[in-house]
């Protein structure tokens, strides 16, 4: 016979941690996750960003989105020196969508997986798949790999599907969000940058 506590467990929404690369990309993810009945918390964990000023600008915009969309928000400390040592060293000349990016995905999603496990989330996912410039399968591979070590399930949501990027562009205009002109690290500042202004 089901108890009252059993019923509460059955109807409580799944708690999902959304690793947020930036406000514009997250703007397409939060509505989809909420529409699926999930309780969303946004986590800004992006030490790949090349300067503290740019990091803070993007963090503040992501938090502004969280307030607007009514979801919890947290961020991890900025440590670009650690990212350079553990991710970029030896891969400075790797092309975009190459080995350096794969290492970066593992680094940032690894931080998210650890945080999700420490705070009792059912799963974690990422806004990285909104961008048409980010290969979703590479992101998924990184998420699954770190999930094996982190103790929290990875939710492989391809947010660019069902016109996710188009939705993000529309919401950026609606909310006046800052859309950066490059992905984040100094090595992504190339003529064909991986992120464009709306």
Residue ranges and their predicted role:
Residues 1-198:
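Nucleotide-activated chemistry modules centered on ATP-dependent adenylation/adenylyltransferase
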């Amino acid at each position: 016979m089901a108890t009252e506590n059993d019923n509460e467990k059955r109807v409580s929404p799944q708690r999902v941690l959304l690793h947020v690369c930036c406000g514009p990309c997250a703007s397409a993810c939060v509505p989809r996750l909420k529409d699926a009945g999930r309780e969303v918390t946004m986590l800004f964990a992006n030490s790949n960003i090349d300067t503290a000023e740019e990091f803070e600008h993007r963090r503040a915009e992501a938090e502004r989105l969280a307030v607007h969309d009514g979801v919890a928000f947290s961020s991890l400390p900025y440590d670009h020196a650690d990212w350079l040592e553990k991710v970029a060293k030896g891969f400075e000349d790797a092309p975009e969508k190459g080995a350096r990016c794969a290492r970066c995905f593992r680094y940032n999603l690894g931080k998210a997986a650890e945080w999700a496990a420490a705070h009792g989330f059912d799963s974690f996912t990422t806004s990285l798949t909104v961008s048409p410039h980010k290969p979703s399968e590479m992101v998924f591979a990184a998420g699954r790999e770190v999930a094996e070590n982190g103790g929290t399930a990875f939710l492989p949501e391809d947010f660019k599907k069902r016109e996710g990027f188009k939705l993000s562009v529309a919401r950026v205009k609606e909310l006046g969000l800052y859309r950066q002109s490059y992905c984040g690290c100094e090595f992504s500042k190339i003529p064909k940058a991986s992120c464009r202004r709306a």
